[in-house]
C-alpha cells in the first residue's frame, strides 16, 4: 500500500516559506520520498499504518495552502505510467536476486 501526498503551499512571505520548509522536512523525516515537485509518497504495511500516518499528517499540516492524500494499493501504484522524463532512483525495479536479507 502507498500513501501519496499532494500539496500546494504559498511561498510569498517569509513565514509562508518557513511553513513550506517545515512541512516538507516533516514528510522527508517521516519516510516519504519525493515523486515529483510537491508530490511525496510512502510505502505502508496496511490500513493500520495508513491510519497512523494520516494522523501524523493531520498533526503536522500547515495553516494555509492545499494538502491532499491518496492511498493506493501496490498494484495500482505499479500501474502508473511515466509519460515524460526518467524514473527516479527509488522507482527502479528490484528483482529477487537483488534483495539482501539480514
From Swiss-Prot:
It is an enzyme of class 3 (hydrolase). InterPro entries: CRISPR_associated_Cas2 (IPR021127), Virulence_VapD/CRISPR_Cas2 (IPR019199). Mg(2+) binds at residue 8. Its EC number is 3.1.-.-. One of its GO terms (molecular function) is RNA endonuclease activity. Keywords: Antiviral defense, Endonuclease, Hydrolase, Magnesium, Metal-binding, Nuclease. Signal peptide: none annotated. Its cofactor is Mg(2+). GO terms for biological process: defense response to virus; maintenance of CRISPR repeat elements. NCBIfam families: cas2. CRISPR (clustered regularly interspaced short palindromic repeat), is an adaptive immune system that provides protection against mobile genetic elements (viruses, transposable elements and conjugative plasmids). CRISPR clusters contain sequences complementary to antecedent mobile elements and target invading nucleic acids. CRISPR clusters are transcribed and processed into CRISPR RNA (crRNA). Functions as a ssRNA-specific endoribonuclease. Involved in the integration of spacer DNA into the CRISPR cassette. Belongs to the CRISPR-associated endoribonuclease Cas2 protein family. Homodimer, forms a heterotetramer with a Cas1 homodimer. This is CRISPR-associated endoribonuclease Cas2. The gene is cas2.
Amino acid at each position: 500500500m502507498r500513501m501519496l501526498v499532494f500539496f500546494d503551499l504559498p511561498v510569498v512571505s517569509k513565514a509562508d516559506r518557513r511553513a513550506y520548509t517545515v512541512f516538507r522536512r516533516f514528510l522527508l523525516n517521516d519516510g516519504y520520498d519525493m515523486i515529483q515537485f510537491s508530490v511525496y509518497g510512502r510505502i505502508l504495511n496496511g490500513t493500520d499504518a495508513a491510519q497512523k500516518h494520516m494522523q501524523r499528517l493531520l498533526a503536522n499540516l500547515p495553516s494555509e495552502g492545499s494538502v491532499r492524500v491518496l492511498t493506493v494499493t501496490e498494484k495500482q501504484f505499479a500501474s502508473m505510467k511515466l509519460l515524460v522524463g526518467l524514473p527516479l532512483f527509488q522507482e527502479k525495479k528490484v528483482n529477487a536476486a537483488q534483495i539482501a536479507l539480514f
